Amino acid sequence: MTVKLDFEECLKDSPRFRASIELVETEVSELETRLEKLLKLGSCLLESGQHYLAAGRAFVVGICDLARLGPPEPMMAECLEKFTVSLNHKLDSHAELLDATQHTLQQQIQTLVKEGLRGFREARRDFWRGAENLEAALTHNAEVPRRRVQEAEEAGTALRTARAGYRSRALDYALQVNVIEDKRKFDIMEFVLRLVEAQATYFQQGHEELNRLAQYRKELGTQLHNLVLNSARQKRDMEQRHVLLKQKELGGEEPEPSLKEGPSGLVMEGHLFKRASNAFKTWSRRWFTIQNNQLVYQKKYKDPVTVVVDDLRLCTVKLCPDSERRFCFEVVSTSKSCFLQADSERLLQLWVSAVQSSIASAFSQAHLENSPRGPGQVSGYHAPGSAATLACGGAARGRESGGVGQVAAQVQSVDGNAQCCDCREPAPEWASINLGVTLCIQCSGIHRSLGVHFSKVRSLTLDSWEPELVKLMCELGNVIINQIYEARVEAMAVKKPGPSCSRQEKEAWIHAKYVEKKFLTKLPEIRGRRGGRGPPRGHPPVPPKPPIRPHSGIVRSKSECPSDDMGSLHPGALLFQAAGHPPSLPTMADALAHGADVNWVNVGQGNATPLIRATAANSLLACEFLLQNGANVNQADSAGRGPLHHATILGHTGLACLFLKRGADLGARDTEGRDPLTIAMETTNADIVTLLRLAKMREAEAAQGQAGDETYLDIFRDFSLMASDDPEKLSRRSHDLHTL
C-alpha cells in the first residue's frame, strides 16, 4: 500500500505535512476532474455505439432487401443470407461489447467518483474544520493574560480538546488519503483490464465468425472470378451485337418479326396494325403471335391475350390488294375475318408465309399423330451425328414403333446380350454402339469415363435408335466381341469380375480389356481359332452397279486376297479387306481391336479407305460400323471421290442417305470437277438426286437462319428405314427409276 501521508508527520502537524496535504488535495481534485471527463466520454462512446448498432442493423436489412429484388438467384440469395447472418452476429457481439463497457464504467469509475471521493471530501472537510478550531484555540490560549488564572485554565482545557480533535481528524484524513490513493490505482487498472477483456471477447467472436465463412468466401471468390470473365465475354458479345444492330438501323433496315421453331410448332411474333370490327374501322397496333396452332395478340405484356384464330387448320390467309391501306392481308376463319397491316412489303410476305406455314404445320402434326405405325419401324430414329444440312431447325425427332423398349428386347435377344458384356449382370439396359456390346449401368459409367474414342455409350431404353444401328448391334453382340477382347483370359488364368464385384474391380477389368488390351491374341491365332466369319446375318448385299467409267477408281467388290491369307495382313490391311464384299463385321472388329487405322489408305487401290471399300460392297452395316468408330465420311481417294461420290456412282441410295446424315460434304468435287449431285443427275438416279437436293435446300435455309420443314427429316427417315429393313426394295426402286 502506498503511504502518501505519514501518521507521525500528521501528529506533528509540521509544514512538511501541510505541504503534503496541499499536494494530495491538488492531485485528488485533478483526479476527480479527469474521472468526470472520462465518464462523459464514456457516455458519448456508448451513445455513438448505439447509433452504430442501429445503423448497422438497418444496413443489414437493406442488404436483405436486395435479395428480394427481381427474380430469385440461388447464388446471390445464398451469398446475401450467409453474409447478413454473419453481420448480425457481429452486431450482436458489438452490442455485448457496449454493455460490458457500460457496466465497467458504472462499476469502477462511477463508483470511485461517487463513493471513494465522497469519503475523501468529508474527511477533508472535518480535517480543516479541526485545523481551524485548533488554530483558534491556540490563538485564544496565547492571548489570555497571566493574571486571569480562571480564563487561562479554561483556554488550556479548550486547547487540549481542540488539539485532540484535530489530531483525530488529521489521522482520519491521512488514512482516507492513503486509502483513496490505492483505490484509485486498483479501480482504474481493473477498469482498463475489464475493458480490454471485453474487446478481446468481441474480436475473438468476430474471428470465429470469419473463420466459419472462410471456405465459403474462398469458393465465392472463385465463382465471382468466373462470373466476371463470363460477364466480360457477354459484354463483348453485346457490344458487337449493339454495333451490328446500330449499323443495321443506320442502314435503314426495318426490324424483322421473331421467327423460330419451338416444341409447340412454328412461332412468329411481331407488331401488326389490326382493323377494328366496329363501325369506325379504326386501326390499332398490337403484338401478334403465332403459337400452338393459334393466332393471338395483346397490347401490353401483362394484358391477357386475345385469340384471333383458335385453330389455324380452320382458316386461310389472303392478300388485300384493293384495300386503301398498303401491305394489308386478311385472315379468314369459319366465324370471322381479321384485317391486318404490316409495315412493309417484305414483312407482309413474311407474315403471309408464316401463317401459311403454320397452317401446313398444323395439318402435318395432326396427320403424324393420327397415322398408324408401319410394321418395319423397329426403332426410333435420331441422328446425333447429322451434318448441318440435317441439323438446322432442331434435332430429328425419333420415330418409334411400340416404344424404345422394343429396341432393348431386340438387342438383348442376341446370343450373349442378355448379360452385361463385362460383369455378366442380367438384363443390361445400356450399350456401347461402337463396340457392339450390351452393358449394365455401372459398367456403362466406367465405359463412359474411358472417352468416346474407346466406347460410345447409349441407353437401350432412354435414347432413340437408328434402324441401321439396331441391326449393327444385333450383328455383333457380346459373344463375338468377347472372343476378340477376352481371347487369352483362360490361358492367362484371369478371373473375370461378376455382378457383385466392386466398382474398382470392374474398372480395373474394363481398363485392362479395352484400353491396355491385355487379353488380345495375335491376329493369325485369332483367325485360326475363330475361323473368320461369313456374310452377316442380314440380307445379302445387292451386287454393286458398274462404275460410270472403267478408270473411275472405284474399289472392286471382289476380295483381292483369299480368306486364308487375311490372317497374315497387318491390322489396317485386314480392316480394308474385311470391309469388302462380302464384309465381315467380326473381322473388322478384330482388326480395330488390334489397332487398325479406321481411315487406313490402300495406296495400291487408288488411296481407297475401308469406308470406300464398304461402300463398294453396298454394306450399310459395315459403313455404319466404320462411322461409329471414327471413319472420315469426307476422306477421298486418288480420284478425289469420297464415300458419297462412290455411293452416288453405284446407285446405293441407302448409303448416300447415311453419309448425308453423317455430314458428308455436298460440294466436294472429284478430279473431274463433279460433285455428287452432278454424278447423280448423270446417272439419272432420282432418289439420290432428291436426297441431295433436299440436303442442299436445308443447307441453304440454315445459312439464312430459317427453320426447316419436317418433310426433310421424314424423307430421310423413310430412306433409312428402307435401307435397313428392305434394301432389296430400295435397290429395285433405284434400278426401276434408273431405267425409266
Swiss-Prot record:
Pfam families: Ank_2, ArfGap, BAR_3, PH. Cells overexpressing Acap1 show accumulation of an electron dense coat containing Acap1 and Cltc on internal membranes as well as accumulation of Tfrc in pericentriolar recycling endosomes. Adipocytes with reduced level of Acap1 or Cltc fail to transport SLC2A4/GLUT4 from recycling endosomes to the cell surface upon insulin stimulation. Residues 1-382 are annotated as: Required for formation of endosomal tubules when overexpressed with PIP5K1C. Disulfide bonds: none annotated. GO terms for cellular component: recycling endosome membrane. Residues 525-562 are annotated as: Disordered. Residues 265-360 form the PH domain. It comes from Mus musculus. GAP activity stimulated by phosphatidylinositol 4,5-bisphosphate (PIP2) and phosphatidic acid. PH domain binds phospholipids including phosphatidic acid, phosphatidylinositol 3-phosphate, phosphatidylinositol 3,5-bisphosphate (PIP2) and phosphatidylinositol 3,4,5-trisphosphate (PIP3). May mediate ACAP1-binding to PIP2 or PIP3 containing membranes. Only one PH domain of one ACAP1 dimer inserts into the membrane, while the other PH domain acts primaryly to interact with adjacent ACAP1 dimers. It is found in: Recycling endosome membrane. One of its GO terms (molecular function) is GTPase activator activity. This is Arf-GAP with coiled-coil, ANK repeat and PH domain-containing protein 1. It comes from the Eukaryota. The gene is Acap1. Banana-shaped homodimer laterally assembling into tetramers, the tetramers further pack helically onto the membrane. Interacts with GTP-bound ARF6. Interacts with third cytoplasmic loop of SLC2A4/GLUT4. Interacts with CLTC. Interacts with GULP1. Forms a complex with GDP-bound ARF6 and GULP1. Interacts with ITGB1; required for ITGB1 recycling. GO terms for biological process: lipid catabolic process; signal transduction. Residues 525-566 are annotated as: Prevents interaction with ITGB1 when S-554 is not phosphorylated. It is a peripheral membrane protein. Transmembrane segments: none annotated. Gene3D superfamilies: Ankyrin repeat-containing domain, Arf GTPase activating protein, Arfaptin homology (AH) domain/BAR domain, Pleckstrin-homology domain (PH domain)/Phosphotyrosine-binding domain (PTB). A zinc finger (C4-type) spans 420-443. GTPase-activating protein (GAP) for ADP ribosylation factor 6 (ARF6) required for clathrin-dependent export of proteins from recycling endosomes to trans-Golgi network and cell surface. Required for regulated export of ITGB1 from recycling endosomes to the cell surface and ITGB1-dependent cell migration. Keywords: ANK repeat, Endosome, Lipid degradation, Lipid metabolism, Membrane, Metal-binding, Nitration, Repeat, Transducer, Zinc, Zinc-finger. InterPro entries: ACAP1/2/3-like, AH/BAR_dom_sf, Ankyrin_rpt, Ankyrin_rpt-contain_sf, ARFGAP/RecO, ArfGAP_dom, ArfGAP_dom_sf, BAR_dom. Coiled coil: none annotated.
